[in-house]
């Protein structure tokens, strides 16, 4: 019987072989054909197109559009951008540690990093950069200025700056250092029992930084912890696995990857002894939490190891691998999808069903599949991680949004910082009434204009009324509504004073105490953090949410 089965199997294999060979041959022929057509097309363009063609620019445009048709993450990286990839992987570069922006022809500092040569030399947010190493910056692009400020560690840089509102003109002599972006931006105790760790990246060393923060907090007496991954775009897969391993036993499978090539089919498990497998954990996420952030949140949810709080995550469940190309260029391509312990894939079903910020739109349950966590709770695939407790995101009024967009908060904080040497510590600083009263005049001096959401809606209504021939009959009513909803700066500043004051206080604090200070100022007003503390303080509710 076995011999007959083997014979039948061999016959079937022999019959299928020509079909497999033909399919492979057709595929190879199609590739060869298309490459030949492309080469012929480029030759004709070079010979006969009416204007001179930059071959590098043309080919780059073609490559970018070709890869864009696959997914948003498969990218061609020319030699000139290799440093960007190294920065994304290591979080390190040689430079002075300052971000810059541009208004018209003016280059200005948006943020000097805490502890960087820029910060130690006295460079401030809002400072106008006039020269770098004696060379004027006017009319040049920010990317060019940024590259000029980067360089070999230990080499000098001279900046000539102008300080707004104070009239100072300064020459700062700096020495480039290794700039390392921390993955743990901030950590502290929230209550006597609850710690807080904000993780903003997954570059090399992220898991070590989280371990060190957790151990320090445990020494301070915490018995629960909040992990904040909001706004974290992800990074290295292994760092995500190691962060999970801090809270999960050795040997636990964390994630599997599945790709077309056998080499991309793999399983990643916890390899070390954990720090604490019992400490209650709350994981904070939002629509900008992506990739490695989603692995950590998803695994903690699948294993019922922590409560997830916030908004649905971005929905990026793809693995990218960097491959070497000719002339030192590289290709960052999608090689696999990752799957977490329940068996679900976090990747959004398609790239078109997304909101303007890139996050996942509404996906009907009929298009997704149901999975179960370790404790039997129901979870779904196809669109990021849905939190156990959903919190509405912080939103701003049209007035405050326009103030952010036009950098009015930034400029007001710049003026305040350059006229005031010190303020109270983060969490204790509050905007004084005299400072608030300066704001309307400041906005008017800066020619600030805005339109309320109601005004925008009314304008659209007017166009519809006009197109349908109703405007003449309703003109009086429309004008009455317009008088009510039109922006009145003094009125609207008072109406939205609480939120505007909060944003101003956060921006001003960051000028004295940097991003760690901003975090300490933000925390008392953060509803998502408050909810996490509430849940972690109630063991019965915490365990109920985990299905235990």
What is each PLM-predicted segment?
Residues 345-352, 356-548:
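Conserved functional hotspot residues or short segments at active or partner-binding sites
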Residues 22-34, 38, 42-55, 78, ...:
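Cleft-lining beta-strand/loop regions that shape enzyme active-site pockets
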Residues 111, 140, 173, 334, ...:
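Short linear motifs in exposed loops
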Residues 49-110, 154-176, 181-186, 523-528, ...:
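Extended, small/polar residue-biased N-terminal targeting/export presequences
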Residues 292, 304, 311, 315-377, ...:
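Polar, glycine-rich mid-to-C-terminal structural blocks
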């Amino acid at each position: 019987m076995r011999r007959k089965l083997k014979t039948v199997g061999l016959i079937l294999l022999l019959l299928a072989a020509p079909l497999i060979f033909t399919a492979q041959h057709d595929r190879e022929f199609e590739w060869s054909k298309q490459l030949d057509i492309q080469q012929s097309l480029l030759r004709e363009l070079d010979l006969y197109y009416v204007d001179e063609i930059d071959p590098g620019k043309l080919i780059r445009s073609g490559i970018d559009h070709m890869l864009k048709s696959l997914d948003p993450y498969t990218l061609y990286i020319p030699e000139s951008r290799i440093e960007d990839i190294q920065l994304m992987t290591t979080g390190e570069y040689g430079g002075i540690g300052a971000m810059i922006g541009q208004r018209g022809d003016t280059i200005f500092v948006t943020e000097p990093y805490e502890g960087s040569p820029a910060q130690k030399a006295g460079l401030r947010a809002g400072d106008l950069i006039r020269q770098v190493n004696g060379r004027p910056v006017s009319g040049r692009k920010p990317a060019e200025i940024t590259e000029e400020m980067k360089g070999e560690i230990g080499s000098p840089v001279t900046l000539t700056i102008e300080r707004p509102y104070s009239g100072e003109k300064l020459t700062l002599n700096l020495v480039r250092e290794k700039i390392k972006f921390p993955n743990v931006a901030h950590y502290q105790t929230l209550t006597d029992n609850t710690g807080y760790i904000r993780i903003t990246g997954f570059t090399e060393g992220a898991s070590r930084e989280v371990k060190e923060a957790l151990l320090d907090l445990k020494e301070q007496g915490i018995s629960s912890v909040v992990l904040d991954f909001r706004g974290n775009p992800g990074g290295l897969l292994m760092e995500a696995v190691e962060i999970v391993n801090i809270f999960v036993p050795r040997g636990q499978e964390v994630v599997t990857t599945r790709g077309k090539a056998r080499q991309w089919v793999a399983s990643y498990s916890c390899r070390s002894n954990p720090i604490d497998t019992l400490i209650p954990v709350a994981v904070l996420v939002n629509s900008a939490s992506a990739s490695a952030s989603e692995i950590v949140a998803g695994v903690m949810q699948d294993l019922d190891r922590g409560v997830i709080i916030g908004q649905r995550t971005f929905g990026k469940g793809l693995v990218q691998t960097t491959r070497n190309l000719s002339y030192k260029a590289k290709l960052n391509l999608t090689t696999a999808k990752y799957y977490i312990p329940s068996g679900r894939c976090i990747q959004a079903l398609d790239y078109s069903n997304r909101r303007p910020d890139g996050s996942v739109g509404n996906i009907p349950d009929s298009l997704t599949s149901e999975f179960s966590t370790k404790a039997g709770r129901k979870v779904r695939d196809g669109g990021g991680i849905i939190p156990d407790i959903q919190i509405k995101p912080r939103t701003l009024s049209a007035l405050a949004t326009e103030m952010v967009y036009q950098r009015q908060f930034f400029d007001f904080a710049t003026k305040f910082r350059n006229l005031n040497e010190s303020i109270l510590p983060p969490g204790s600083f509050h905007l004084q009434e005299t400072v608030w009263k300066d704001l309307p005049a400041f906005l008017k001096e800066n020619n600030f204009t805005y339109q309320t959401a109601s005004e925008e809606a009314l304008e659209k209504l007017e166009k519809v009324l006009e197109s349908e021939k109703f405007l003449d009959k309703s003109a009086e009513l429309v004008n009455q509504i317009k008088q009510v909803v039109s922006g009145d700066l003094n009125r609207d500043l008072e109406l939205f004073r609480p939120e505007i004051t909060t944003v101003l206080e956060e921006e001003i604090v960051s000028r004295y105490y940097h991003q760690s200070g901003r975090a300490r100022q933000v925390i008392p007003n953060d509803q998502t953090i408050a909810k996490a503390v509430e849940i972690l303080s109630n063991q019965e509710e915490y365990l109920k949410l985990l299905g235990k």
